[in-house]
Amino acid sequence: MPRSRINGNFIDKTFSIVANILLRIIPTTSGEKEAFTYYRDGMSAQSEGNYAEALQNYYEAMRLEIDPYDRSYILYNIGLIHTSNGEHTKALEYYFRALERNPFLPQAFNNMAVICHYRGEQAIRQGDSEIAEAWFDQAAEYWKQAIALTPGNYIEAHNWLKITRRFE
């Protein structure tokens, strides 16, 4: 049974109903419908913290999905899971891949910046200020891109850029 039929969450049920209606009325191929079903089930599993199941669904959705824009969101969600699991190198790889297909994902730039900032803080704790500065500079570049795409968002990042004199 598809995951969307067993989820008891009201919002997930509502999303599933709306998604099913859209799948019926919007002209799509069976492959696109199947890809979306896997994507939807991946999001449901991810929201419940079932990351292994979510990844399986996302990988299957990637196999079926041909639209670069839709693939970007699948890749982004895979990156989120790797971030949650502390697999930052893998997460960065998936965020990069998502941005290759859709350069207008400010949340991917933000998450990449957060990872770089975290690595900068780790370098400071290890006593390597030069490496830390390089990570912080990279974080700044990603945050600038996120802010440029969505002015008014990422206020904490914007303040950090000003405080550290990295905002131009």
From Swiss-Prot:
Renumbered ranges of TPR repeats: 35-68, 72-105, 120-153
TM region(s), chain numbering: none
Keywords carried by this UniProt record: Chloroplast, Membrane, Photosynthesis, Plastid, Repeat, Thylakoid, TPR repeat
Subcellular localization(s) per the UniProt record: Plastid, Chloroplast thylakoid membrane
Entries under InterPro entries matching the protein: PSI_Ycf3_assembly, TPR-like_helical_dom_sf, TPR_rpt, Ycf3/AcsC/BcsC/TPR_MFPF
A Pfam family that the UniProt record links to this protein: TPR_1
A cellular component annotation (GO) from this entry: chloroplast thylakoid membrane
Annotated family: Belongs to the Ycf3 family.
Cited function: Essential for the assembly of the photosystem I (PSI) complex. May act as a chaperone-like factor to guide the assembly of the PSI subunits.
Name this protein carries in UniProt: Photosystem I assembly protein Ycf3
Organism: Vitis vinifera
Gene encoding the protein: ycf3
